[in-house]
C-alpha cells in the first residue's frame, strides 16, 4: 500500500507510444498505490483513456512527468480525448511536473455527456495547468490542492459541463496562474444548481471566471485573492447565478474586485466582500462604488473591507470588522477544513475565523511610549478594527517615515470622525515623510475612498528625486479635511504630476477642504484634482487660506462643481504655468481674495468649460493677479461668470482674454493692465462674452486697450454698447506684488 514501492514507467519517444497505461473501453478497473512515470523529453503522458469506459478508479497514486513549461498535450498525466468515461474517479493522488494540464478529459459527447466524474483529494505541483474537463456532466471536483510557481494558465477549466457540478474545498495557490476557476458554457437548471463553494484561490489574474453562457452556478463561501485583475469576472450570456458569502480581493490599482457583464449575470448577490486597491470595487457598465452597485438591487448587506489575509497561501482574514458578516446557507454547514459553520453569524469566505479586539473610539497617542509607536500601526488598527465613535490620534513630536495607504474605515461618519494631528498643534514638530522611488510608492498618505478624516498641524514631506506626491486621493471620498499643514517637495521646474503635493486623479471627493496650509517646491501643480465624474461632479471643494511658493503651478480642479477658492497666496519666481486652472467646474463657484504674484506665470486664473446659470452665477472677485502672460483667461464655453473688483498686472500678454463660446458673463470694477507695448489690456472674442461690462479700467502701453474684431480704442469699444463708464488710465500700481493704485484720477 505504498505508491513509492511500485514504479510503472515508460520513456516515450513518439506519439504512438506516449503512455504508460492505455485504457481503451476498459470498465471497472482500479489503479491504486502506484507511481506512474513517463519522463520522455517530448512525450510524457501516463494514463490514456479512450473509447467508452465505466467505473475507472485511480486512487492514491503518483504521477511524475517531465519538467517543462510547454503547453503541449503530449505532457498530460491523465489524458482522455474522446474518452466517454462514466464514473471516472481520480482521488488522493499527486501530480508533479508536466505540461499543459495534469488531467485533460474531453468526452466529445455533447448529446449525452458522461456523468460521475470525481476528482478529489489530489495535489498538483508545477503541472503548468491543473484540471480540464469538457462534456462531462454533474462533475465533482473537491478537496484538491493546485500549487507551484510553474503553473501558468488554468487551475480548473470546465467547458460544457452541465448539471449539478460540485467544485468545493479546493486550494489553488499559484502566483503565476491566469485563472483560478474558469467556466465556459456550464449550464445547470433551477432546482438542480451547480455549486462552487469553500474554495481558496490565490492567483495572478482572475479568481473565478464565468465566461460565456453559464447558468445557475451558486458561488458560496469562496476566498479569493488576485494580484493583477478581477477576483470575479462574468461575461456575456451568463445568467441566474448566485453569489453569497464570498471574499473577493484584488491588489490591482486599476481593476475592480468584481466585473459584472450586466445585472442579469446574478439574480441573487449579497453578503460579499468586494475589496480592491483601485477606487471602485465593482464594474458593471462602468466603474461603480458599492453604494452605486447596491442601487441596482444587489448586495445590500455586502461590504468593501480589506480582509487583511494572513498570507497569500492560506487567506485567513484578520479583519475584526469582517468577522461574522456572512449569512446562513442551509446546505453548507462546514467550512473548507470541516469546521462547523456558525448557524447564526457565519463568516464570509472559505473558512470560519475569529478575530479578537474591538472598534476604536476616543483619543490615542502616537509616538515613543504612546498607544502606537508609529503612524502606520495606528492606521492599520483603523483599517482592521474600524471605529465606534470619534477618534483622534495625537502625534508626538518627531519624524515618521511611514508611507501608508488607508481605505474606507468601517464606522466612520459625520459624527464618528477620524483626526490625525500633532499633539502640540505645531506642524513643524511632526514630519510625516517618504522618499518615493517609483510611481507605486509615490505618496506619504494615500486615501482610497476614505471618509470623514481630518489631517491637521502636520508636515508632509516627500523629496524623491523623480516622485514627490504627499497626499494621494483616489475613489469616492467624503469630508476629507487638510488643515494647517505643510507640504515640502522636491526643488524642480518639472511639469510632471509626479511632483504634485495633493494628487487626486480620479478622486470623486465631495466636501474636500484644504485650508490654512503651505506648499513649498514641487512640479506640475501643488494641488491637482480631477474627479473624472462628468455626470455628477462632486461639490463642496474648498481651498482657502493656503500659501503656494515655487510649486511650478498652483491649483488645478476638473469636474468639481460649486467650489470655493478663497484667500490663497500663490507666489515665487519658479511658478511657470497656471495660478488657478479650473476646467468643467460648473455652478456657483467662488474664486475670491486670492493673491497671485509670480513673475513667470503664463496664466493667473484660467477657466475652461465652467458653466454656471442665471440666478446661480459664479464669482471671480477681489483677486490680485500679477503675472507674466495672461491675467484672467476665459477660454471655451464659460457661462455666467461674474468678474468683479479684480486688480491685474501682466507684463507680456492680456490682462483679460476671452475665447470662443463663452457668454452671459459680467465684467465690472476691474483694473486690467498690461505692460506690453504690443498687447491690448482686454481681448474680447465677441460682444456676447459679456452681457454687462462697465466701470472697468483697461490700460496698456500699446495704442489700443481693447481687441474686438480688430484693435479698438475705448471709445470704439463703447460704440458696441459696453463700458460706457469705463476708463483707460494707468493705475500707477505701487509695486508688482501689492498692486495698490496710486492714481488720483482712478480713485
Where are these regions (language model features)?
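Right-handed parallel beta-helix/beta-spiral solenoid domain characteristic of secreted/periplasmic
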Residues: 1-42, 65-70, 75, 303-307, ...
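Surface beta-loop-beta hairpin patches that serve as ligand-binding interfaces in beta-rich domains
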Residues: 287-306, 316-358, 711-732, 736-747
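Parallel beta-helix/beta-solenoid
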Residues: 3, 16, 23-26, 31, ...
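Extracellular beta-strand/beta-solenoid scaffold signature
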Residues: 10-22, 40-50, 69-82, 97-114, ...
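Acidic Gly/Asp/Thr-rich repetitive segments characteristic of extracellular carbohydrate-active
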Residues: 293, 337, 358-395, 399-405, ...
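Acidic glycine-/aspartate-rich tracts in secreted/extracellular proteins
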Residues: 2-3, 251-253, 274-280, 326-329, ...
Amino acid at each position: 500500500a505504498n505508491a513509492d514501492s511500485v514504479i510503472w514507467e515508460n520513456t516515450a519517444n513518439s506519439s504512438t507510444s506516449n503512455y504508460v497505461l492505455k485504457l481503451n473501453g476498459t470498465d471497472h478497473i482500479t489503479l491504486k498505490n502506484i507511481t506512474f512515470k513517463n519522463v520522455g523529453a517530448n512525450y510524457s503522458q501516463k494514463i490514456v483513456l479512450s473509447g467508452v469506459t465505466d467505473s475507472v478508479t485511480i486512487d492514491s497514486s503518483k504521477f511524475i512527468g517531465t519538467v517543462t513549461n510547454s503547453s503541449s498535450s503530449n505532457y498530460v498525466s491523465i489524458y482522455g480525448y474522446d474518452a466517454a468515461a462514466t464514473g471516472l474517479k481520480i482521488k488522493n493522488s499527486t501530480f508533479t511536473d508536466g505540461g499543459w494540464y495534469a488531467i485533460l478529459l474531453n468526452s466529445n459527447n455533447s448529446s449525452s455527456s458522461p456523468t460521475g466524474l470525481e476528482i478529489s483529494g489530489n495535489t498538483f505541483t508545477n503541472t503548468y495547468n491543473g484540471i480540464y474537463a469538457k462534456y462531462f456532466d454533474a462533475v465533482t471536483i473537491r478537496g484538491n490542492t493546485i500549487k507551484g510557481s510553474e503553473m501558468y494558465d488554468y487551475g480548473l477549466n470546465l467547458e460544457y459541463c452541465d448539471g449539478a457540478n460540485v467544485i468545493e474545498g479546493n486550494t489553488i495557490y499559484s502566483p503565476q496562474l491566469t485563472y483560478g476557476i474558469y467556466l465556459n458554457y456550464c449550464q445547470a437548471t433551477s432546482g438542480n444548481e451547480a455549486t462552487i463553494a469553500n474554495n481558496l484561490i490565490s492567483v495572478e489574474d482572475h479568481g473565478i471566471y464565468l465566461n460565456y453562457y453559464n447558468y445557475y452556478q451558486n458561488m458560496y463561501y469562496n476566498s479569493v485573492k488576485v494580484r493583477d485583475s478581477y477576483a470575479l469576472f462574468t461575461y456575456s450570456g451568463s445568467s441566474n447565478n448566485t453569489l453569497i458569502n464570498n471574499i473577493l480581493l484584488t491588489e490591482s490599482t486599476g481593476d475592480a474586485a468584481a466585473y459584472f457583464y450586466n445585472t442579469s449575470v446574478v439574480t441573487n448577490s449579497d453578503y460579499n466582500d468586494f475589496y480592491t486597491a483601485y477606487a471602485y470595487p465593482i464594474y458593471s457598465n462602468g466603474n461603480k462604488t458599492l453604494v452605486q452597485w447596491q442601487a441596482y438591487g444587489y448586495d445590500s448587506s455586502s461590504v468593501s473591507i480589506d480582509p487583511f489575509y494572513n498570507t497569500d497561501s492560506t487567506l485567513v482574514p484578520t479583519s475584526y470588522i469582517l468577522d461574522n458578516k456572512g449569512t446562513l446557507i442551509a446546505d453548507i454547514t462546514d467550512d473548507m477544513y470541516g469546521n462547523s459553520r456558525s448557524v447564526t453569524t457565519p463568516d464570509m469566505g472559505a473558512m470560519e475565523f475569529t478575530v479578537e479586539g474591538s472598534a476604536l473610539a476616543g483619543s490615542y497617542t502616537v509616538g515613543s511610549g504612546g498607544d502606537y509607536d508609529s503612524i502606520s500601526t495606528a492606521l492599520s488598527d483603523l483599517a482592521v478594527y474600524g471605529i465606534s465613535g470619534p477618534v483622534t490620534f495625537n502625534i508626538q513630536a518627531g519624524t515618521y517615515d511611514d508611507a501608508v495607504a488607508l481605505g474606507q474605515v468601517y464606522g466612520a461618519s459625520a459624527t464618528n470622525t477620524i483626526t490625525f494631528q500633532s499633539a502640540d498643534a505645531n506642524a513643524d514638530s511632526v514630519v510625516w515623510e517618504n522618499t518615493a522611488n517609483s510611481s507605486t510608492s509615490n505618496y506619504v498618505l494615500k486615501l482610497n475612498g476614505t471618509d470623514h478624516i481630518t489631517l491637521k498641524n502636520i508636515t508632509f514631506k516627500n523629496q524623491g528625486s523623480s516622485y514627490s506626491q504627499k497626499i494621494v486621493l483616489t475613489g469616492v471620498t467624503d469630508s476629507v479635511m487638510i488643515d494647517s499643514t505643510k507640504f515640502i517637495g522636491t526643488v524642480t521646474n518639472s511639469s510632471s504630476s509626479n511632483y504634485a503635493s495633493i494628487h487626486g486623479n480620479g478622486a470623486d471627493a465631495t466636501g474636500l477642504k484644504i485650508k490654512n496650509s503651505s506648499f513649498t517646491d514641487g512640479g506640475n501643480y501643488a494641488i491637482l484634482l480631477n474627479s473624472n465624474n462628468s455626470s455628477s461632479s462632486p461639490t463642496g471643494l474648498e481651498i482657502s487660506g493656503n500659501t503656494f511658493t515655487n510649486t511650478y503651478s498652483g491649483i488645478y480642479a476638473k469636474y468639481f462643481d460649486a467650489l470655493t477658492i478663497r484667500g490663497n497666496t500663490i507666489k515665487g519666481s519658479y511658478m511657470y504655468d497656471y495660478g488657478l486652472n479650473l476646467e468643467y467646474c460648473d455652478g456657483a463657484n467662488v474664486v475670491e481674495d486670492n493673491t497671485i504674484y509670480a513673475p513667470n506665470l503664463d496664466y493667473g486664473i484660467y477657466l475652461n468649460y465652467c458653466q454656471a446659470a442665471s440666478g446661480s452665477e459664479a464669482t471671480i472677485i477681489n483677486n490680485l493677479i500679477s503675472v507674466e502672460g495672461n491675467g484672467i483667461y476665459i477660454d471655451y464655453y464659460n457661462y455666467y461668470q461674474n468678474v468683479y473688483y479684480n486688480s491685474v498686472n501682466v507684463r507680456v500678454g492680456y490682462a483679460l482674454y476671452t475665447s470662443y463660446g463663452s457668454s452671459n458673463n459680467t465684467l465690472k470694477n476691474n483694473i486690467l493692465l498690461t505692460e506690453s507695448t504690443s498687447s491690448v489690456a482686454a481681448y474680447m472674442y465677441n460682444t456676447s462674452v459679456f452681457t454687462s461690462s462697465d466701470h472697468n479700467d483697461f490700460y496698456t502701453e500699446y495704442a489700443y486697450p481693447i481687441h474686438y474684431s480688430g484693435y479698438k480704442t475705448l471709445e470704439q469699444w463703447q460704440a458696441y454698447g459696453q463700458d460706457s463708464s469705463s476708463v483707460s488710465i494707468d493705475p500707477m500700481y505701487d509695486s508688482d506684488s501689492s498692486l495698490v493704485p496710486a492714481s488720483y484720477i482712478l480713485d
